[in-house]
Amino acid sequence: MKSKWILTAALALGTVALTVAQAEPVADSTVTIGRVKVALAESNWEKYPAPSLGIKVASGHGEIRSEAGLLVLRRPDGQVAAAVMLGATWGRSQLSISNSCTMQDGLYVHDFSGGQSQAMECVRAGGPFPTDMLVSQAMPRLKAALEPLSLKLPEVSYPVWLFMANRNASIVMVEGVVAADFVGLPNQTPLGKLPPNLQPMVAAWADTLGATSKQAVNSMSGELAMPTVAFGSSQSAP
């Protein structure tokens, strides 16, 4: 009989110290993080190391094995247009999950599980908000990944949070910010109710990221196709 592990620190910071943070080449617009293979639509992404997820289990038997990476998208002039911390596990035995995908004022929230009590398939998005405030107050994992770097983020951004997990302890987690001229997916409709000020195409983009992340968590291949990240100004990232 397999051991049954209980997820107790989904938001705990990883403990891996980063002493050197250099961009890694993104071969063929694909990166591997944990068991997840992330396909990127754009050619100008960079990957940096990030602290592992550090998800502990209640039984005291250590952590669920995981890996994380910081994905940075630059504009043609070199400015940062998006920064996404993506973490994934390799899975470990059985996982008991409690659903905490609840509505939050001012945010778009969609529960891909349909409200199941023992599932965690949640996407949140909002904004645009001041980026420094977002990262320092609401994105601890992204903040930890950015600390070794000297990156100038967009002043105002759309935030996206994602947590997908199954009972085999296969997990994908995202904390990311995308510049305020982000166009999202204009031809798609959000799956949930929009908060004030959030553009529907941004919520639709978050939904699409959620759907492909859920597929990655539950598939043998672990393939995750990042939706197109495009911008509306003359500074658009190709």
Locations of the language-model features?
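Bacterial N-terminal signal peptides
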Residues: 8-17
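Short acidic-hydrophobic surface loop/beta-edge motif
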Residues: 27-33, 71-73, 120, 124, ...
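Bacterial N-terminal signal peptides that target proteins for export
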Residues: 1-9
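Short, well-structured beta-strand
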Residues: 130-234
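Low-complexity, serine/threonine/proline-enriched polar segments
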Residues: 87-147
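Generic detector of solvent-exposed, compositionally biased contiguous segments
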Residues: 37-69, 123-158
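N-terminal Sec/ER secretory leader and immediately downstream segment
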Residues: 23-112
